[in-house]
Amino acid sequence: MEFILTFDDKVIRFINDNMRSRFLDKAMKLVSASGNYGIVWIAAAFSLIAMGGEKRRAGLLMIASLMVEASACNLIIKPSVKRVRPNDAHGLVISIDRPKDYSFPSGHTAAAFAAAYSLYLSNKRSGIWMLYSAAVMGFSRVYLLVHYPMDVVAGAVIGMLSAGFVHRKSSK
């Protein structure tokens, strides 16, 4: 566990000291903001639902995956783990509004991967592109200093497990 905490701290310090740029600041803020409250993923799901047919089913499964992920992260894991965010732990200045909840796991990343993996399970060709966007979402949260790398990894795993669970249950 100590190795993970040390690794997380080193990555955060490296990003803060070496990777800052105006372009990345703006780009990562835009990426991160698109995931606020899961808006982009919910919009994608409702777009699929509106298309009907198999796409409707994919959208409904995406919504269900997001609900499972959000419940796991926000109602169970974050309140249990209570990990302080890196900007608060290290006194770092951040360029977005200061999040008020805990750091572990990354909810933005969990939602992104729940939606993306759900789509991937329904349609691999479309889903692979959404998985790439989910990875960028995760990076944005570390870049903006509001999550540690392991928060993002855990969010990705929880999101994918949530989608896998929903898809397994729906096929029975």
Predicted segments with their positions:
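Membrane-helix interface segments
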Residues: 23, 54-58, 123-129
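Short helix-capping/hinge motifs at transmembrane helix termini and TM-loop junctions
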Residues: 51-52, 81-82, 145-148
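Interfacial segments of alpha-helical transmembrane regions
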Residues: 45-71
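Alpha-helical membrane-inserting segments
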Residues: 47, 68, 72, 76-77, ...
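Membrane-embedded catalytic cores of phosphoryl/pyrophosphoryl-handling enzymes
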Residues: 91-172
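Alpha-helical transmembrane segments
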Residues: 34-40, 63, 126-132
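N-terminal transmembrane-helix/juxtamembrane module of multi-pass inner/ER membrane proteins
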Residues: 1-40, 74-101
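Small-polar-interrupted transmembrane alpha-helices in polytopic inner-membrane proteins
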Residues: 64-78, 128-141
